[in-house]
Each structure stands twice: as C-alpha cells, then as structure tokens.
C-alpha cells in the first residue's frame, strides 16, 4: 500500500488527486494511468487492473492511496470548523461515550468522521448506514496526522 499527499497549489482537489494517483501508479507499475470507471454507487475503479485506489481532498490538500487490495482514504483539515452538534447525529452510542469524555471533542469528532468516511468509501455503499451504525475507537491506528490533516486509511 502506498500513500501520497500534496497541497492543492491552485489545482482543484480532483486534479491534484488524479495527479497523485498517476504518480503512484507509474511508480508502482511503470505504466501510465489506465482508464477509470465508477460503480453504480460512484466508487471509482480500474476495470482492467489488479490495483485499487482511493482519493480524498480538503480545501488545501489532496490524498491518494494505491493498493492491491480494496482500499479507502479520507482526510480532513485539523483546523476545520466542525459543529459539535453533529455528534448526536453521526455517532453510535459507543462512539458518543468516547466523545463525551474526550479532552478535545473537536478532534474526537474529526477522528470519527474520517473513519466513517473511509469505511463508507471502502464498502462502496457511501454514507448510508455509516453515520451512526459503526463502533470505532478514538485510538484507531488507521488514523494519522498528515500535512495538518487527520487521515484515515482502510484496507481489506
């Protein structure tokens, strides 16, 4: 599994993400980026390649992960203004219990958010069912800081 990130530097998140993907794919395979299709639920994939990928972007950064396994990535800026009221809507009971005692509730909510987004991307189902039907931990090792962002990467 390979992960790359960059600042947008005047590009759209889509443009920067595709450039990261093209670079990772070339580094891994020595080939140009193949065509990309999307599933009926919008998950992008390579139809004729054993490689899987995921792209995420924020207002300032893009992230890409490339793997031989189904993979997903989500990133959020650490300084993102997130409404704490969302916790009641998107957290499961076990997650809400962790959130309620967290020293930094904004960071806790962002942690759960990137985990939920990555899980939704990994499943290919989107956020339906994910906001409050998960049981993630604030100590989940799949979340890391990268370029001033919280980033979650999941792989099957």
What residues fall within each predicted segment?
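Core catalytic alpha/beta fold that binds nucleotide/phospho-ligands
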Residues: 1-156
């Amino acid at each position: 599994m390979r992960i790359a990130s960059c600042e947008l530097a005047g590009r759209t998140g889509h443009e920067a993400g595709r450039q990261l993907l093209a670079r990772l794919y070339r580094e891994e395979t020595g080939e140009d980026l193949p065509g990309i299709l999307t599933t009926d639920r919008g998950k992008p994939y390579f139809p004729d390649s054993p490689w899987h990928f995921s792209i995420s972007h924020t207002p300032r950064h893009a992230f890409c992960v490339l793997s031989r396994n189904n993979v997903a990535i989500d990133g959020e800026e650490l300084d993102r203004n997130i409404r704490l009221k969302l916790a009641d809507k998107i957290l499961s009971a076990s997650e809400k219990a962790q959130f309620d005692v967290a020293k930094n509730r904004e960071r806790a909510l962002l942690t759960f958010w990137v985990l939920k987004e990555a899980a939704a991307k990994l499943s290919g189902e989107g956020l339906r069912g994910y906001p409050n039907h998960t049981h993630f931990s604030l100590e989940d090792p799949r979340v890391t800081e990268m370029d001033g962002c919280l980033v979650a990467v999941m792989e099957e």
